[in-house]
A protein has these predicted regions:
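Anionic N-terminal interaction surfaces
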Residues: 1-53, 62-63, 68-69, 100, ...
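A short local loop/turn or secondary-structure capping micro-motif enriched for an aromatic residue
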Residues: 50-53, 87-89, 108-112
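Canonical phosphoinositide-binding patch of PH/PH-like domains
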Residues: 96-111
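Short, acidic/hydrophobic/Gly-rich beta-strand patch recurrent on exposed beta strands
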Residues: 89-96
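Short, compositionally biased
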Residues: 57-59
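Phosphoinositide-dependent membrane-docking surfaces
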Residues: 41, 66-84
């Protein structure tokens, strides 16, 4: 059963869901669920973890008072993994030069990378 609460297209396949931090350059740090599908990257923001609690409404879609960030796969230009002993991150760079960082803390980013690269 799919974990993502965001409505998926009929032909869209969920590849995985993980609870992560999500950092939007100059837009904040959020804690929530990252879902990777074969068509999109969907981030359900449960909590604004940044000092600046202003949400950039241009990126987010609201469904039933819940905030979702949706990035179509075709907008992603590059996927850049960064691994250190205490911090594992993936930077997604879009075709409009926005950077979105998936911060998975000390946990392995390999399953997320596999889903993103498939």
């Amino acid at each position: 059963m799919a974990k993502c609460k965001f409505p998926l297209d009929v032909d869209e396949k969920e590849l995985g869901t993980w609870t992560t931090n999500f950092i939007i350059t100059e837009g904040g740090r959020y804690l929530g669920d990252l879902t990777v599908t074969d068509k999109r990257i969907i981030y359900f923001s449960k909590f604004d973890a940044s000092l600046n609690a202003v949400i950039n409404k241009a990126f987010f879609k609201t469904i039933d008072q819940e905030q979702y960030l949706v990035i179509p796969r075709e907008k992603i230009q590059s996927i850049i993994p960064k691994k250190s002993m205490l911090n594992k991150r993936i930077t997604l760079v879009t075709d409009d030069d926005n950077e979105f960082i998936v911060d998975y803390g000390m946990l392995s980013i390999d399953p997320i990378l596999k889903a993103l690269e498939s």
